[in-house]
Amino acid sequence: MHKFWPRHSPNFMACRVAVRTVQPRDITVGLSGGADSLALVAALCAEDYNVHALCVDHGLQPGSHEVAQQAAHHARTFGAHAEIISVTVAPGNLEANARTARYQALHSRNLPVVVGHTADDQAETLLLGALRGKATGMQIHTDNLWRPLLGVRRATTLAACTELGIEPWHDPHNANTDFLRVALRTQVVPLLSDIIGGDAVPALSQAATLIAEDTHALHVDTPDDRIAQLAGMPPALRRRHLVALLQAYGARVSAAHLRAVDALITNWHGQKAVPVGNGLEVTRKDGRLSVS
């Protein structure tokens, strides 16, 4: 390992301390070229991880391949192995489909995956989920995915890049308020900070972390489809079973779907089957919920 960082680099040191939570030493790291992922790759290299930096080119913007090449160059100067992979994003929901394609590429190398989500991303995730009727949060480690920077601010990763003497890529999509996450980041979070007279991100991020921990504790591996058992559960636990049941069949899970399916259990009056997307529907039959 060669030392590529200056002696005085407190922001970069904060990133280095954060990544020490990552347990596997051979890892794939998602690298967009932005400040978060550059600081992440650099910190992992400084901590002597065997880093395979994967630059996913979605091909959605002019010059995207050049951005990926520059990101890969930075990663190699840190001592990482770097690779560029091009993906095709399915039409429809651009954000969601790009994310799906990106994670498929990252997991294709059969190594634990590390990504650069920060505390700011955690706060935005909470608000996004709340607006969709289901507040959510991210965990530092789930299955084969690590997010070690969840306790680090976006401003810290940007400052770390400055300390390292590198200029991160600034994604034009991050200025497009047509994307809900961007609108929350640039309009709602600053407004909340003004209202409380301070930075709203730490409290939002902490709330999201607590929700993520609760979600993990209540995770259901094998959902129960028996009406009597479901009816006797506390509502929060019953919802977990319904979510797991719908996901097991590839149905869409929304607040409206959950309410309608829950009514088959708690407010049964002979209602018809509940459509749950992807051509599937849920019916109540012989004391069980059936998805077909």
Curated annotation (Swiss-Prot):
Membrane-crossing residue ranges in chain numbering: none
GO cellular component terms, semicolon-separated: cytoplasm
GO BP of this protein: tRNA modification
Keyword Nucleotidyltransferase: no
Reactions catalysed according to its record: cytidine(34) in tRNA(Ile2) + L-lysine + ATP = lysidine(34) in tRNA(Ile2) + AMP + diphosphate + H(+)
EC number, as in UniProt: 6.3.4.19
Positions that bind ATP: 32-37
Record function comment: Ligates lysine onto the cytidine present at position 34 of the AUA codon-specific tRNA(Ile) that contains the anticodon CAU, in an ATP-dependent manner. Cytidine is converted to lysidine, thus changing the amino acid specificity of the tRNA from methionine to isoleucine.
Family, as annotated: Belongs to the tRNA(Ile)-lysidine synthase family.
Protein name in the entry: tRNA(Ile)-lysidine synthase
Gene name, Swiss-Prot/TrEMBL: tilS
